[in-house]
From Swiss-Prot:
Expressed in brain and to a lower extent in lung. In brain, it is found in cerebrum, cerebellum and spinal cord. In embryo expressed in the notochord, developing spinal cord (in a ventral to dorsal gradient), dorsal root ganglia, cerebellum and dermatomyosome. The lineage of its organism: Eukaryota, Metazoa, Chordata, Craniata, Vertebrata. Ca(2+) 2 binds at residues 315, 344, 346, 393. It comes from Homo sapiens (Human). Its main location: cytoplasm. Residues 601-714 form the PI-PLC Y-box domain. GO terms for molecular function: calcium ion binding; calcium-dependent phospholipase C activity; phosphatidylinositol-4,5-bisphosphate phospholipase C activity. This is 1-phosphatidylinositol 4,5-bisphosphate phosphodiesterase eta-1. The keyword Lipid metabolism applies.
Amino acid sequence: MADLEVYKNLSPEKVERCMSVMQSGTQMIKLKRGTKGLVRLFYLDEHRTRLRWRPSRKSEKAKILIDSIYKVTEGRQSEIFHRQAEGNFDPSCCFTIYHGNHMESLDLITSNPEEARTWITGLKYLMAGISDEDSLAKRQRTHDQWVKQTFEEADKNGDGLLNIEEIHQLMHKLNVNLPRRKVRQMFQEADTDENQGTLTFEEFCVFYKMMSLRRDLYLLLLSYSDKKDHLTVEELAQFLKVEQKMNNVTTDYCLDIIKKFEVSEENKVKNVLGIEGFTNFMRSPACDIFNPLHHEVYQDMDQPLCNYYIASSHNTYLTGDQLLSQSKVDMYARVLQEGCRCVEVDCWDGPDGEPVVHHGYTLTSKILFRDVVETINKHAFVKNEFPVILSIENHCSIQQQRKIAQYLKGIFGDKLDLSSVDTGECKQLPSPQSLKGKILVKGKKLPYHLGDDAEEGEVSDEDSADEIEDECKFKLHYSNGTTEHQVESFIRKKLESLLKESQIRDKEDPDSFTVRALLKATHEGLNAHLKQSPDVKESGKKSHGRSLMTNFGKHKKTTKSRSKSYSTDDEEDTQQSTGKEGGQLYRLGRRRKTMKLCRELSDLVVYTNSVAAQDIVDDGTTGNVLSFSETRAHQVVQQKSEQFMIYNQKQLTRIYPSAYRIDSSNFNPLPYWNAGCQLVALNYQSEGRMMQLNRAKFKANGNCGYVLKPQQMCKGTFNPFSGDPLPANPKKQLILKVISGQQLPKPPDSMFGDRGEIIDPFVEVEIIGLPVDCCKDQTRVVDDNGFNPVWEETLTFTVHMPEIALVRFLVWDHDPIGRDFVGQRTVTFSSLVPGYRHVYLEGLTEASIFVHITINEIYGKWSPLILNPSYTILHFLGATKNRQLQGLKGLFNKNPRHSSSENNSHYVRKRSIGDRILRRTASAPAKGRKKSKMGFQEMVEIKDSVSEATRDQDGVLRRTTRSLQARPVSMPVDRNLLGALSLPVSETAKDIEGKENSLAEDKDGRRKGKASIKDPHFLNFNKKLSSSSSALLHKDTSQGDTIVSTAHMSVTGEQLGMSSPRGGRTTSNATSNCQENPCPSKSLSPKQHLAPDPVVNPTQDLHGVKIKEKGNPEDFVEGKSILSGSVLSHSNLEIKNLEGNRGKGRAATSFSLSDVSMLCSDIPDLHSTAILQESVISHLIDNVTLTNENEPGSSISALIGQFDETNNQALTVVSHLHNTSVMSGHCPLPSLGLKMPIKHGFCKGKSKSSFLCSSPELIALSSSETTKHATNTVYETTCTPISKTKPDDDLSSKAKTAALESNLPGSPNTSRGWLPKSPTKGEDWETLKSCSPASSPDLTLEDVIADPTLCFNSGESSLVEIDGESENLSLTTCEYRREGTSQLASPLKLKYNQGVVEHFQRGLRNGYCKETLRPSVPEIFNNIQDVKTQSISYLAYQGAGFVHNHFSDSDAKMFQTCVPQQSSAQDMHVPVPKQLAHLPLPALKLPSPCKSKSLGDLTSEDIACNFESKYQCISKSFVTTGIRDKKGVTVKTKSLEPIDALTEQLRKLVSFDQEDNCQVLYSKQDANQLPRALVRKLSSRSQSRVRNIASRAKEKQEANKQKVPNPSNGAGVVLRNKPSAPTPAVNRHSTGSYIAGYLKNTKGGGLEGRGIPEGACTALHYGHVDQFCSDNSVLQTEPSSDDKPEIYFLLRL
């Protein structure tokens, strides 16, 4: 480019003269190969960005971007000119433009020399300007050009104006899906001149700005500007420091940004940055994802050559395929300037004694060796000074070898002189720094045993050209008189069809391994063709050609098991030995060839002596370069990886593509980089995935062609295939929040072009590196919006060796039948910059995605529990040591598949078409789908050696679940939190055993459970786990040990983390104990209170065994997270038939969500380590879920105006899926003195920030799945007094498990909860639906599951259509029921609940009950004051709008905005919990931890009901002196609600007179008016079975009804008459269950001796906790006034 310098200094007059001539157009002759010249009018477009011509049949393609012009040459220099006879054209009228990746040439002839001179000058001037401009200027220029071009293309009639119809068409083309009225409104606002109804270009610019206002950036600006519409210098500096993690931010730097990017002159004067300037800044290279410092060389360049990866090219001279393409010297210039440092020259004897360069035995064109050397000399060091390696493949005679040596010395001169190079210590290669400006010749060297006087000698002739088998070589002499032209046309025809097919299939297909084994096919076809007589009939040729095509197919990889070599190239395999004989591994079966080499050429080879790849034995000589074809190299990597790595620490290795890649496709370089190979040679002329990876790898370090290998690869032993390759080193955690996309185009190969449908984009992020790091994950699909889609999703990855990892962003257009590639960008992990960044897609002008990046370091073995959501529990159970655990057959199992369905739960199956069609926005490769491991060719090729099971075990490829991340990704990790992790031994043996038998089987023994544990790995794991934790079972529960169990992610991968508060002491903060108690031995089993009976199975889904979708064994619901290790609170559970169920291996206990909740409550803590000090903006973006992407203002409006966040308030912004009004407000939850604000979360989706509010009371939380709209669950925390009964009283007596030791009123912590301020995402509130009762003794999981209300947020529509992957707990749980696996749903409950929840849901969705009933907030809170044993179902809140409007500014009455009217059967009285904890929880994608029978499998033993008697039996543990006296008092309610008998028992036991001022939240409504659409109807079979069960149970109860109630009996009493009472009770669960116990007499320590269910609360005034509560408000406990008897069913599952 040096010659362009001259053109930068041309006088403006001359430049303008050139430009005007070029823009007005010039008639020239365009020469084409094999045709006569065509006369065309060539002109420069008005933006001076494109050279165009007309007429042209393909007007769209008749253009050349100035940016893509590589060089312009004068005269007749190109090959096409050379083919023309001398004298045909005047050389001074000729010039050639080289452009594009393949160096295509456009050969032009003008009518006179003057015109040619003008064009050459003008083009070179434009090229010089482009080459000189900085990246910012270029970005601005290309943007301006793009807008102008867009305007012109939209202006169909060419009048320079756009009317509304043209605007609508443009919107479709730009993938904008806005309502027409909105477009018209913006159009009218922009149309300001007198010419109404049309837009000029200036007006269009205004319109375009309005249309493309970045809501995400606007929110970002607001959050840092204190809600102003601009940033001051100080605010900008704060943003750069806090969010963008920039150091040394000075005032001058900020002023410079304002000066450079601000558009408004007024703002510039005030030194503030408005939204337009801020947008320009954020879209500039300064905020690109790639670290700008890495545009320069920044690595240490003084290490030996073998410590670097070196950018290498294969058959550099070719412009296309390996058989027929043109060879051009310009390719050398191009690749050298692209940063390539090792080029290949194939030398052959040429005519006239001149060696030529071409691909031997093929029909590629020839170029002179001398021209090649001159080009290399000219361009080698233009871009950088680091050494160039010239890989000479020598096939010449001795005479021409001497000519080669002569040219090299004569042209390169001193560049070949290596005498001055300092090699450092002995036997070490020199460094790139010491070789600057030098050219190394890589070639054969005469053996040392020859004397120095020997002029020539024999050397082996093993090289890539000779990989072509002799019978496949094209000899250019033909016995039957066939001409070369005939042969060439025959081959060309075959090859073109082949290449076309190859291109079609080469779209990012991980299994595609482009053409191979084709030379032979071609050769056979050729011979058959040649055997025919030259005058063979046309028809004969045709049919023959057709039959030959079968040989030309591009074959999918069909590797068998890894026990065979990986290679799919059968032909090559036959040439290679099996490798059984040591040392002979790579010796080819054929004879070794030799050739003569002259001394002159041998002497030029110094540090790069090519040796035949016989074996990787280091003979002690430095300077040997081993050359392998990809297939041979693959065998070495696979079978001798550690030896190979050690060899590569001292010597160079070059890997080149297989000779069967005749289409010049590229192999995957990754396995060879991982093995330490330095020179991995690719076909630079072939664009595609592999070249993109190569470009990304070398772009770092200033694109100088040398990238330092990680130190572990440079010394010592290192096994790249290990599951934990660097156990002692910290790992990196990448938390990547994909926020939005901008101007994503339609797919390049879209059938209808711009007229095609608006795209439905999603983003896939892939980590490419060591096998253990390779994985990918993706966002959900956004429908119909390519212009500004918003995903707001967080993906988390853990990387063991970030130095070699690449991060690849892919944008796809989702399609029911597949997906179309839109664009990509690949960046090295080490070049990522934290903060808010734009990822510009390669080769697309405006298209980008906006992300937030956080990179944390993870230290120590246990740290993945906290920070890395992708660790499986297996890693911690020592799977690496006990390989038999997963049937490991040794480290290198030869199974090539990514995973196999039989032995790996990670197996990703292809989805059926029907399945895909159902998944739209909830949808597509939706977020619910797990990260597929190594779903690309790389991994297959490299990891053939590692069995999938091994990988899972070792924690490899484990990233199947979404991030645990709960904080804005900008948050630094607080390392202090890492200290107190405990061992994850909290599951008990019982949990495990139950798990094994968790399948519900119907009478025929058919499996109904969707989560069968087939995998023996799980069973082994279970046993191991149980043994490790069973010891914990027998602790005396009366000590009040706090049990908090580990909830870990499913096998799909994630560890939620765990905590183990210390036993035997009162804790005010369940989670804080986690930090205080580092002693793992104190970790109590979640079920320590259980007797060691195998019947209890709370953690059945511990591993997240997948639930299959109905009827389709192929489709897994790939649960992202699983709520497991749940604590079963026996206070809520009645264990009925332990013995009977033990036999069946069933869980005999009904499972309360609270138990789960409790369990999970601590989990976040661990994660929280990653999350301290939130940055406001992350909250913002986190909080605003732009659900309705099509409404430009929707999210902003949701956020702005609700920004008054105080320390004691949590901002809640709700942007609802169902387009209900978006409300937000402040949650009146003051921060209660915390030692450390820990955030925790496992919100995989968007929700990131929320605090666990763990009060002295029990923390209970339920797991909810984050849908595409992340959800944070809200928990209620209640204080449970611990039962003092003896541990052996009864199983139930141990029920206090999950309860924290209560802080009774006298205790100092009584009133203190742990509730830091926590912005939560809007949708996080919606999780309430799934996280119903926080510690509810009465709401069992069945309530959640059976209650469609929970599904409010699931999918975007009715349950029926939702695919299992939609990640809502509510959805999923409902799905279980739908599928007949209702995990704990009582059939009758189902029936009762149906109406309510559906109605409830509809009410919420339609918002029709805004004003139904509005008790004052204080009243509602009053009702809470005295609740002792109760947890509130947040469902009710949700329904009540409490959550939705959480005290929004606009709605002080608030609590009722969305209260649906309920039927009489559903009077939900909703007490409000003392505190809300917002905890993003992994969802219950997997079956609930306590497994139940499916509805069809219930038997009469499972249900006990009594329609007449009073409470028949009470669990002994609940009865204490305080209760016995009150036992007669009963509570009435108005409805025939399906109430949990157990709850009812509790309620009866602990209930006291209610006071009178509580209002009913739900008014009556006829049950039969309730909508029922969302609930699965029971089949007639199920209904009859339920009736049968009920009747049998009734008979049984009748028989027993005279018996005296036995307090310790586990049977359920199901009916009692209710005394009348004046007002309805507020104690009703949202599911209809009563909440046990309105304890009035608890002001003192009276509760000490009583066993209260785990959700119990002491009587506290709420004033100190909630601003909405008056200090003296007390919970009312009046019974309800309806005399109808109530029927209860108690399920024993």
